[in-house]
């Protein structure tokens, strides 16, 4: 039920992982649903961004769907077509964290493609809201385990969750 927009923007069929002591990198391809790049949108918000990507790319498929680099424990750098997103986590307490998100675009997009920027950020925020719900559910589950005196992890679904074991 989570990530219908992102899940139809990227494909994990060619998911690649690279892991080091303090980082992990995931690279995923661009979805080719219905036989063409970005052929089906999972949500109206993502449809708007997919159309903006294809318009800016003049119908050509982007090289990658996304590259997600996590530098433990507080930095994530995400590459999507024509945008770099940097997220920095700031701990406010044991149960509270602020995520500072910055978006970087090529000059041509910033100067002349406001629709691209707005569509991309709306799609990104849609996925963020889904991620927040997942994180809250995980926190509730971990709290329930702690209250029972249990400490369990996994099972992990490979290859999608290989980074969780890292």
Indicate where each model-derived feature is located.
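C-terminal catalytic domain of Rieske-type non-heme iron oxygenases
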Residues: 1-166
């Amino acid at each position: 039920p989570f990530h219908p927009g992102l899940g139809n923007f990227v494909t994990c069929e060619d998911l690649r992982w690279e892991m080091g002591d303090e980082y992990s990198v995931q690279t995923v391809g661009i979805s080719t649903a219905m036989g063409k790049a970005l052929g089906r949108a999972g949500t109206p918000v993502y449809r708007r961004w997919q159309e903006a990507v294809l318009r800016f790319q003049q119908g050509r498929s982007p090289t990658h769907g996304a590259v997600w680099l996590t530098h433990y424990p507080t930095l994530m750098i995400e590459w999507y077509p024509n945008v770099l997103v940097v997220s920095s986590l700031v701990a406010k307490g044991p149960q509270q964290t602020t995520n500072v998100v910055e978006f970087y675009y090529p000059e041509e997009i910033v100067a002349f493609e406001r629709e691209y920027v707005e569509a991309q950020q709306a799609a990104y925020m849609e996925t963020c809201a889904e991620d927040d719900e997942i994180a809250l559910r995980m926190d509730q589950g971990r709290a329930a385990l702690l209250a029972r005196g249990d400490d369990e992890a996994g099972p992990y679904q490979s290859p999608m969750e290989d980074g969780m074991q890292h």
